[in-house]
Amino acid sequence: LHLLSRRQRQMCIRDSDYPTVTIVEIMGRNAGWLTAAAALAKSDDCEGVDLIYLPEKVFDIDHFMARVKEIAAKGRSMVIAVSEGIKVADGRYVFELSEHVEFVDAFGHKQLAGSAKFLANKIGAELGIKTRAIELSTLQRCAAHMTSRTDITEAFNVGGAAVKAA
């Protein structure tokens, strides 16, 4: 997200008369800690993510649209991080608000995907702002080159304990 935020800011400098929105959908189902980590993208050379939405808090689509409109009115491009599991007040996942085929995994769980695309389409249709949706999906699971020393150590220890328990 740091790289994405930085690139988005560079585009903003070149194209400030026409704000754009990039919505990144991050895995996590009902736990938003990965999405919350998007706040860590802020640094001295990068403003970071503008808006972050987690599944632990009810998603208010009207408030979301108002915030996007407010930021866009300043002529700024923006980056928004949303958890795949964000839900509206009636308990439905945001992606369920779109007209799509519903998928379930081998365990019968709803396959969570499409919140970013739904929101991008809504922003484009209602606010006329160029918007992109990015669903990292499998890519975020396969980024072993980004693994921290802590992650490697914990995975090694858990694997060792599993072998001993078997």
Go through the PLM ranges and name each one.
Residues L1-I13:
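Single conserved hydrophobic/aromatic residue that forms the stacking wall/gate
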Residues R6, R29-N30:
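Short, amphipathic alpha-helical segments
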Residues Y18-R29, A38-A161:
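Glycine-rich phosphate/diphosphate-binding loops and the adjacent beta-loop-alpha structural elements
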Residues V163-A166:
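Short, hydrophobic alpha-helical segments
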